[in-house]
Amino acid sequence: MKFIVEREHLLKPLQQVSSPLGGRPTLPILGNLLLQVTEGSLLLTGTDLEMEMVARVALSQPHEPGATTVPARKFFDI
C-alpha cells in the first residue's frame, strides 16, 4: 500500500475518526486506526466497539491499494 496526501487534507478527518479512541482501550487494537486505500480515496476508520467513525480523504496522486492499521495517537502526532 502506498499513497500521498497533504497533511492539511488529512488533519480534520483524522481528528474526527480519532474521537472515539480516547483513553486507554481495553483491547490494544482499538487504539489503532484502519487505513484503506481504494479507488482514489483513503478511508480512515476508528472504533471503540460501541461507536465507529469513518472518514474519506480524496487522493490526487497515483496510489497502490491496500489496508493496514496504525496507532492513532502516533499517526496524529506526525
Swiss-Prot record:
Lineage: Bacteria, Pseudomonadati, Pseudomonadota, Gammaproteobacteria, Enterobacterales
Family: Belongs to the beta sliding clamp family.
Name of the protein described by the UniProt record: Beta sliding clamp
Annotated transmembrane regions: none
Principal cellular location given in the protein's record: cytoplasm
Keyword RNA-binding (UniProt): no
CDD domains: beta_clamp (cd00140)
Keywords tagged on the record: Cytoplasm, DNA replication, DNA-binding, DNA-directed DNA polymerase, Nucleotidyltransferase, Transferase
Assembly and interaction partners: Forms a ring-shaped head-to-tail homodimer around DNA which binds and tethers DNA polymerases and other proteins to the DNA. The DNA replisome complex has a single clamp-loading complex (3 tau and 1 each of delta, delta', psi and chi subunits) which binds 3 Pol III cores (1 core on the leading strand and 2 on the lagging strand) each with a beta sliding clamp dimer. Additional proteins in the replisome are other copies of gamma, psi and chi, Ssb, DNA helicase and RNA primase.
GO cellular component, one term: cytoplasm
Keyword Cell wall biogenesis/degradation appears in the UniProt entry: no
Domain of life per record: Bacteria
Entry's Gene Ontology BP terms: DNA strand elongation involved in DNA replication
Subcellular localization, as worded in the UniProt entry: Cytoplasm
